[in-house]
Amino acid sequence: MGKGTPSFGKRHNKSHTLCNRCGRRSFHVQKKTCSSCGYPSAKTRSHNWAAKAKRRHTTGTGRMRYLKHVSRRFKNGFQTGSAKATSA
């Protein structure tokens, strides 16, 4: 048997499993690194030659729980909870 089509039927071991950070099935079991996000390294994996991949994972593609309110708060000067005392 050669290395072509017939031998592909014998492959049944998983080399990648689910990643704890990005959730994709890209975490290499033996290398212990994610091919998608680069986990466990502190910085998320990103390359300039993968422009489409950057577009998919960049800021603004998720919920942005905190960041979506920052522009409005900036416009008002980051006011705190206490109201200003009115001079009468």
From Swiss-Prot:
The gene is RPL37B. Residues 37-57 are annotated as: Disordered. This is Large ribosomal subunit protein eL37B. Present with 19700 molecules/cell in log phase SD medium. Binds 1 zinc ion per subunit. It is found in: Cytoplasm. Belongs to the eukaryotic ribosomal protein eL37 family. The lineage of its organism: Eukaryota, Fungi, Dikarya, Ascomycota, Saccharomycotina. A zinc finger (C4-type) spans 19-37. Gene3D superfamilies: 2.20.25.30. One of its GO terms (biological process) is cytoplasmic translation. One of its GO terms (cellular component) is cytosolic large ribosomal subunit. Keywords: Cytoplasm, Metal-binding, Ribonucleoprotein, Ribosomal protein, RNA-binding, rRNA-binding, Zinc, Zinc-finger. Component of the ribosome, a large ribonucleoprotein complex responsible for the synthesis of proteins in the cell. The small ribosomal subunit (SSU) binds messenger RNAs (mRNAs) and translates the encoded message by selecting cognate aminoacyl-transfer RNA (tRNA) molecules. The large subunit (LSU) contains the ribosomal catalytic site termed the peptidyl transferase center (PTC), which catalyzes the formation of peptide bonds, thereby polymerizing the amino acids delivered by tRNAs into a polypeptide chain. Zn(2+) binds at residues 19, 22, 34, 37.
